[in-house]
From Swiss-Prot:
This is Cytochrome c-type biogenesis protein CcmE. Residues 138-165 are annotated as: Disordered. Residues 29-165 are periplasmic. HAMAP family: CcmE (MF_01959). It comes from Rhodopseudomonas palustris (strain HaA2). Heme binds at H122, Y126. Coiled coil: none annotated. GO terms for molecular function: heme binding; metal ion binding. Residues 138-149 have a biased composition (Basic and acidic residues).
């Protein structure tokens, strides 16, 4: 074998090893690529009791009930399906009915999602009070930070999204 042939064999071998490694990584990550499952996905996939996953959706208005101590129950919906959730702990400050939520836990045998962690989602206009105060103090605050963006039904032009001068 000449030097050129050996070099080509090494490059080819390294390429094969790289392809196999990428394939193994992608295969291992196949089940965990989705950040959360919606209630509709939970019903369609028939997830077995005890298997941990993340459930995401909107807290159904009127479904929040508080029990003894820190126990709460609510329903998470995606518009097509609903999953009852039970949680014992302190809820995040942004947690509200009609607000987005992601809960981590597992289904029990009765089909109730037993969450051990609840995360409240917020829209893109949310800004922590500390950050807003710091921006105001430094003189970088703009009045349009407090304005809501146009809703999904409103036509938003490029001019409407441009900061006021």
């Amino acid at each position: 074998m000449t030097r050129k042939q050996r070099r080509l064999m090494m490059i080819g071998g390294a390429g094969v090893v790289l392809v196999v490694a990428v394939g193994l990584v992608l295969n291992a990550m196949r089940g965990s690529i989705v950040f959360f499952s919606t209630p509709k996905m939970v019903h369609e996939q028939n997830i077995e009791a005890g298997k941990r996953f993340r459930l995401g959706g909107v807290v159904e208005p009127g479904s929040l009930t508080r029990g003894d101590q820190l126990a709460v129950a609510f329903k998470v919906s995606d518009g097509d399906a609903t999953v009852p959730v039970a949680f014992k702990g302190i809820l995040p400050d942004l947690f509200r009915e009609g607000q987005g939520v992601i809960a981590e836990g597992a289904l029990d045998t009765a089909g109730v999602f037993k969450a051990d962690t609840v995360l409240a989602k917020h829209d893109e206009t949310y800004m922590p009070k500390d950050v807003a105060d710091a921006l105001k103090k430094q003189g970088h605050w703009k009045d349009d930070y407090e304005k809501k963006p146009p809703g999904p039904g409103a036509a938003a032009s490029a001019d409407a999204m441009r900061p006021a001068r």
